[in-house]
Amino acid sequence: MSSSVQVLSETIEIGKVVTASDEIAKRFNNLFPSIPMMLATFIAFVIVFLLLFFFLYNPVKKMIRKRQEFIQSQIDDSIKAKEDSLAKLSQAQAELIESHKQSVNIVNNAKSKAQEILASYKNKAISDANRLIEETQIDLNERKKEFDKNSRILIAETATEIAQRILKREISKSTQDEIIKDFLEDKTPIEDI
């Protein structure tokens, strides 16, 4: 009711007398556009659609396809880079394990070499000590023989002097040398004399 009053008030303002049924019919006719207008709108829509399709949709679709290809190539590159990095990581780990084995071998070889050198120096020191002991023993034996010889000479000379005094006669040099020679050739140890 309020709309019909409003319609009436509009018609009164304009100065024309319009009935409510005329107004409703006019509005009802305005709901359906005219066929030429509808056809022109449809043709304009088709033209705009085709223009948008060829000038906007296809380039956008190509750009989207290129973007998808770029993204896919980036994904493929990242997958390949990941695989490469995993391969390099496993290779580095294998090299680390190998270098660890080599370092253990080097340490073990160094230990065994050090033990061999230590044993060599120990054996050399023992042989040098034994050689020194033998040389010292030989030297002691030679000195003992020298001492025994000198002692025999001294004893022979002393005995000759004592014999001369006892006999109060002079022994000739040849007799003295003969007695000393016999005494020196005697192999009886000094302790037994």
Curated annotation (Swiss-Prot):
Any one GO MF annotation of this record: proton-transporting ATPase activity, rotational mechanism
GO cellular component, as recorded: plasma membrane; proton-transporting ATP synthase complex
UniProt xrefs under InterPro entries: ATP_synth_B-like_membr_sf, ATP_synth_b/b'su_bac/chlpt, ATP_synth_F0_bsu_bac, ATP_synthase_B_chain
Subcellular location(s) per record: Cell membrane
Keywords, ordered alphabetically: ATP synthesis, Cell membrane, CF(0), Hydrogen ion transport, Ion transport, Membrane, Transmembrane, Transmembrane helix, Transport
Membrane topology annotation: Single-pass membrane protein
TM ranges: 35-55
Biological function: F(1)F(0) ATP synthase produces ATP from ADP in the presence of a proton or sodium gradient. F-type ATPases consist of two structural domains, F(1) containing the extramembraneous catalytic core and F(0) containing the membrane proton channel, linked together by a central stalk and a peripheral stalk. During catalysis, ATP synthesis in the catalytic domain of F(1) is coupled via a rotary mechanism of the central stalk subunits to proton translocation.
PANTHER family (alphabetical): ATP SYNTHASE SUBUNIT B, ATP SYNTHASE SUBUNIT B', CHLOROPLASTIC
NCBIfam families on file: ATP_synt_b
Family: Belongs to the ATPase B chain family.
UniProt subunit comment: F-type ATPases have 2 components, F(1) - the catalytic core - and F(0) - the membrane proton channel. F(1) has five subunits: alpha(3), beta(3), gamma(1), delta(1), epsilon(1). F(0) has three main subunits: a(1), b(2) and c(10-14). The alpha and beta chains form an alternating ring which encloses part of the gamma chain. F(1) is attached to F(0) by a central stalk formed by the gamma and epsilon chains, while a peripheral stalk is formed by the delta and b chains.
Protein name: ATP synthase subunit b
Organism (species): Mycoplasmopsis synoviae (strain 53) (Mycoplasma synoviae)
Gene (UniProt): atpF
